[in-house]
């Protein structure tokens, strides 16, 4: 196999066909690692350019266009895709002038199927859930993650479960989760406690966790960088500014740029 799970703290390795979130040895976060040397001969800019703009699945997806760098050993018919990605770059002359820089672009991840970058990660996470034979997927969320999980669970035939707190909930996103048929459970606790409950449900009931602790989500989110650089003629920008929450995107972007 050309991919494995590796602990980011102690370096312990695991096969990708196991249901794991933290490292069994030290409790550290896991990362999906690919054998890039083995993949080098099958990956090229020309390959990704040839797939761009086509209608064939899964290459039409802005995530799975880069499949060799996301999940190389995966069979194409296992992929759960809407498709997502292929979000536009918008140049802003006025803001460029205001900021005193030559060129400024905005990458509009709101153009994804459920309206956020979470769809890039969820296609990877839900695909892995199906690979593992899981029947139910769950997350703790106050907004975008719940909408994305519910949508991709519905598209893949899995049961989606969302735990959300009793305040600071994005009702528009929650309505998407309800519309896509997810079981939505309101809990009188903050986000961290809801995430603990999701982990407990996973262990006791065999439900697959799809919060950012799931490393396969970051594999999808790193394609924002692949796509951005491809849109710029395979040139990396001088600076990249990204909002930070739990910094999952920061980690994913670092993987993509590496």
Model regions: which residues?
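PLP-dependent amino-acid enzyme catalytic core
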Residues: 1-258
């Amino acid at each position: 196999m050309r991919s494995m799970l590796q602990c980011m703290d102690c370096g312990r390795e695991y096969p990708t066909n196991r249901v794991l979130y933290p490292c069994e040895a030290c409790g550290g976060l896991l990362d999906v690692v690919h054998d890039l040397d083995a993949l080098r001969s099958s990956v090229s800019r020309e390959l990704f350019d040839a797939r761009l703009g086509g209608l064939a699945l899964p290459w039409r997806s802005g995530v799975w266009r880069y499949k060799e760098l996301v999940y190389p050993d995966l069979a194409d018919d296992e992929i759960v895709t809407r498709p997502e990605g292929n979000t536009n770059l918008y140049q802003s002359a006025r803001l460029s002038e205001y900021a005193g820089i030559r060129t400024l672009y905005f990458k509009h991840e709101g153009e994804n199927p459920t309206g956020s970058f979470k769809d890039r990660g969820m296609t990877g996470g839900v695909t892995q859930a199906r690979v593992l034979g899981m029947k139910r997927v769950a997350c703790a969320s106050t907004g975008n993650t719940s909408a994305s999980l519910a949508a991709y669970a519905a598209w893949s035939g899995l049961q989606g479960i969302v735990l959300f707190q009793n305040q600071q909930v994005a009702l528009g996103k929650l309505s998407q989760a309800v519309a896509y048929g997810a079981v939505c459970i309101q809990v009188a606790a903050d986000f961290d406690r809801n995430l603990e409950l999701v982990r407990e449900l996973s262990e006791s009931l065999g439900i697959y966790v799809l919060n950012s602790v799931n490393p396969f989500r970051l594999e999808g989110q790193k394609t924002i960088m692949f796509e951005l650089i491809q849109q710029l003629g395979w040139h990396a920008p001088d600076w990249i500014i990204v909002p930070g929450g739990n910094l999952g995107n920061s980690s994913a972007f670092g993987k993509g740029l590496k």
